[in-house]
Design a protein with these regions (language model features):
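Cleavable N-terminal export/targeting peptides
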Residues: 1-21, 250-251
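Transmembrane beta-barrel domains of bacterial outer-membrane proteins
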Residues: 18-251
Length: 251
């Protein structure tokens, strides 16, 4: 993850000192959800992470984010984590009219918890992303799309990765908004002997109630998802419903 300090150095070196702003914003977020139906290795899912824009120069911001995804089941104990997946990303955001364009380097590393693992399971993606606020105001609509290619992978064989997401708040009820979110991730795969499967698509659709105020957001949601490669070293897809909450804060 050497891209973050390189991006910061380039921005600082190419702009007048008076125009460089350090740490213009920071964010934290938390998500917890219950699988339905619950399976032995999949009872709960948790995400926790934080991020920061390290420096802002004119319309560009160098940033870094870090997230941990934890999968909880009851294989060994009634309530025990069995997977910990680390997501690290560094890059540069740049304003492009109403949209925001991003050049990013994303790293994912997956691990068992309290279990032996000899085979490394990780990958890096270098790519671009565009986030566009199609509609603002009391009923906002936001579209995000990205395309990237792996620069390194262990075991998984991933090559191209394309992601598209729509987040909309079609109506409001008092201080709350009803929201819906849909996400599709398409991955091309170079087949490997240990993982006998080709390319795939992950899909999730969720809806619920959202409260937002001064950069703070609480979502209560229900979701349906189809997710591939849920087990670290075995190919396969997992279809499930999830019920949970998401808290985020941007300052």
């Amino acid at each position: 993850m050497r891209l973050a300090p390189v991006a910061v150095a380039l921005l600082l070196a190419t702009a007048p000192p008076a125009r460089a702003e350090l740490l213009p914003d920071v964010s934290v977020h938390l998500r917890a959800a219950r699988y339905a139906p619950a399976r032995t290795d999949f009872h709960w899912q948790g995400w926790i992470g934080a991020g920061a824009s390290l420096v802002r120069v004119r319309g560009a911001r160098a940033y870094f984010t870090s997230d941990v995804e934890t999968i909880i089941g009851n294989t060994l104990r009634a309530f025990e984590a069995n997977q910990a997946n680390y997501h690290l990303e560094a890059g540069v955001h740049h304003a492009a009219g109403r949209a925001t364009a991003t050049l990013f380097f994303h790293h994912v590393s997956r691990h068992y918890v309290d279990r032996p693992k000899v085979q490394a399971v990780d990958w890096n993606v270098l790519g671009g992303r565009i986030a566009w606020p199609v509609r603002t105001g009391p009923r906002p609509l936001r579209v995000t799309a990205s395309l990237g290619h792996t620069t390194l992978d262990s075991l998984v064989g991933y090559r191209w990765e394309a992601i598209a997401e729509i987040d909309a708040e079609p109506s409001r009820v008092g201080a709350a908004a009803l929201f819906t979110r849909a996400n599709v991730r398409v991955v091309s795969v170079q087949e490997r002997p240990r993982l006998d499967r080709g390319g795939f698509a992950d899909v999730s659709v969720e809806g619920g109630t959202r409260w937002s105020r001064d950069g703070r957001t609480l979502d209560l949601f229900a979701a349906l998802e189809r997710r591939n490669d849920v087990l670290l070293e075995v190919a396969g897809a997992h279809n499930s419903a999830l019920f949970g909450f998401r808290i985020s804060y941007l300052r």
